[in-house]
Curated annotation (Swiss-Prot):
This is Transmembrane protein 235. The lineage of its organism: Eukaryota, Metazoa, Chordata, Craniata, Vertebrata. Glycans are attached at N41. InterPro entries: PMP22/EMP/MP20/Claudin (IPR004031), TMEM114/TMEM235 (IPR039951). Keywords: Endoplasmic reticulum, Glycoprotein, Membrane, Signal, Transmembrane, Transmembrane helix. The gene is TMEM235. Residues 1-28 form the signal peptide. GO terms for cellular component: apical plasma membrane; endoplasmic reticulum. It comes from Homo sapiens (Human). It is found in: Membrane; Endoplasmic reticulum. It holds the Pfam family Claudin_2. The chain crosses the membrane at residues 96-116, 126-146, 176-196. N-glycosylated.
Length: 223
């Protein structure tokens, strides 16, 4: 039973850490980083690179020293007269800001289910909760993957609008917010695997009350 307790404790801690990482990722503004290279020592605007560089999250973008401004609300952009490619970007952004917060809610529900199944010592509930966490990790993975696709398409749309010559000194990368989301996804899958292992361990363990041997049954019958 010590092995079972260790598996359940590790799964609970993994789920809590997964929630914390994903919550920090969703709330932070370092998913996508855009850095502009310096124009050279002879530039008439020495601080140009810092002013044009930016980093953004799911909800807002921060540009240089100008502070952060909210991104365009994808749910309020249906009536805008934009191109098909921009409409596709809006749909992707809408999917991201729905899927990832939904993953947070599902993590809370999964943690509650895991607590109940641990207290009940039920194999079927542990199996259900383990599969639940694995499916939740797939949902988180889908949200992160959609964001990656959204970011690549948004940069390609920007290059198409302004021309490649204006984007030569621009370097884009994903920030630590993305790393937190990947870590949350991995921990969620890890917790689900631990719960499945706990269900398997519990199914192999003998009942707590034990079974009487035939000699014990005969002895009690004689009494």
């Amino acid at each position: 039973m010590a092995r079972l307790g260790a598996l359940l404790l590790a799964a609970a801690l993994g789920a809590l850490l997964s929630f914390a990482l994903l919550a920090a990722a969703v709330a932070s503004d370092y998913w996508y980083i855009l850095e502009v290279a310096d124009a050279g020592n002879g530039s008439a605007w020495p601080g140009r690179a810092e002013l044009l560089s930016s980093h953004s999250g799911l909800w807002r973008i921060c540009e240089g020293q100008n502070g952060c401004i909210p991104l365009v609300d994808p749910f309020a952009s249906e009536s805008l007269d934009v191109s098909t490619s921009v409409q596709h970007l809006i749909l992707l952004h809408r999917a991201v800001i729905v899927v990832l917060p939904l993953s947070l809610v599902l993590l809370v529900c999964g943690w509650i289910c895991g607590l109940l199944s641990s207290l009940a010592q039920s194999v079927s509930l542990l199996l259900f909760t383990g599969c639940y966490f694995l499916l939740g990790s797939v949902l988180t993975l889908a949200g992160v993957s959609i964001y990656i696709s959204y970011s690549h398409l948004a940069f390609a749309e920007t290059v198409q609008q302004y021309g490649p010559q204006h984007m030569q000194g621009v370097r884009v990368s994903f920030g630590w917010s993305m790393a937190l989301a990947w870590g949350s996804c991995a921990l969620e899958a890890f917790s689900g695997t631990l719960l499945l292992s706990a269900a398997w361990t519990l199914s192999l363990s003998p009942p707590i009350c034990g079974h009487l041997s035939p000699q014990q049954v005969g002895g009690r019958g004689g009494d």
